[in-house]
From Swiss-Prot, chain B:
A GO cellular-component term linked to this record: cis-Golgi network
Parts of the chain that traverse the membrane: 5-24, 33-52, 59-79, 93-110, 117-135, 150-168, 179-199
Stated role: Receptor for the C-terminal sequence motif K-D-E-L that is present on endoplasmic reticulum resident proteins and that mediates their recycling from the Golgi back to the endoplasmic reticulum.
Location of this chain's protein in the cell: Golgi apparatus membrane; Cytoplasmic vesicle, COPI-coated vesicle membrane; Endoplasmic reticulum membrane; Endoplasmic reticulum-Golgi intermediate compartment membrane
Coiled coil: none
Similarity comment text for this entry: Belongs to the ERD2 family.
Keyword field: Cytoplasmic vesicle, Endoplasmic reticulum, ER-Golgi transport, Golgi apparatus, Membrane, Protein transport, Receptor, Transmembrane, Transmembrane helix, Transport
Side of membrane Cytoplasmic, spans: 25-32, 80-92, 136-149, 200-212
Species assigned in the record: Xenopus laevis
UniProt name for this protein: ER lumen protein-retaining receptor 1-B
């Protein structure tokens, strides 16, 4: 499974 | 973090502070759409639930806390503290037309079918259209105070700067998040008309007013 994108943005 | 992302965050923060100060100093929320502010409070609440599950950085956490707290402060000022000055008669956009479709879309198009991920996606979609009640109010009254125009410009340019940030990240980090990019494009497009008026009128010292 693809990782969901890292939520490092606001 | 690249320069576009940083400037985007700063302009977002500036927008929030400009609005808070405008209302607090003038003791009035005339010309401000309470509905848009309510939508932004929902946006921040549903997006930053990861405050409880993930720690990314001190910067990240503090900005999120400031965004959430200030959005609630703004809503409180409009609907409680300075309620008498709130121009509800002109704030007539039907927010269910924004909330329902974005909620449905977030169930259909998301990265992962989990509660946190769906709420995050919902917040991205809702943010892209949350300014519509405010823009509707400006078009209905045909004018906006200059300080409100500065607020709208700072808020609009923030997502535009994020678009450049995403181009940068795709180029140098091979990172991209299609949901955020498409929503960010929609969000930016909604401001284009306003950007034009801002540059041609407000920056030349005139008040923003629309032809009757």
């Amino acid at each position: 499974e693809e990782e969901t994108p890292l939520k490092d943005e606001l | 973090m690249n320069i576009f992302r940083f400037l985007g965050d700063i302009s977002h923060l500036s927008a929030i502070i400009i609005l808070l100060l405008k209302i607090w100093k003038s003791r009035s929320c005339a010309g401000i759409s309470g509905k848009s502010q309510l939508l932004f409070a929902i946006v921040f609440t549903t997006r930053y639930l990861d405050l409880f599950t993930n720690f990314i950085s001190f910067y990240n956490t503090s900005m999120k806390v400031v965004y959430v707290a200030s959005s609630y402060a703004t809503v409180w000022m409009i609907y409680s503290k300075f309620k008498a000055t709130y121009d509800g008669n002109h704030d007539t956009f039907r927010v269910e037309f924004l909330i329902v479709p974005t909620a449905i879309l977030s169930f259909l198009v998301n990265h992962d079918f989990t509660p946190l991920e769906i709420l995050w996606t919902f917040s991205i979609y809702l943010e892209s259209v949350a300014i519509l009640p405010q823009l509707f109010m400006v078009s209905k009254t045909g004018e906006a105070e200059t300080i409100t125009s500065h607020y709208l410009f700072a808020l609009g340019i923030y997502r535009t700067l994020y678009l450049f940030n995403w181009i940068w990240r795709y180029q140098f980090e091979e990172f991209f998040d299609l949901i955020a990019i498409v929503a960010g494009l929609v969000q930016t497009v909604l401001y284009c008309d306003f950007f034009y008026l801002y540059i041609t009128k407000v920056l030349k010292g005139k008040k923003l007013s629309l032809p009757a």
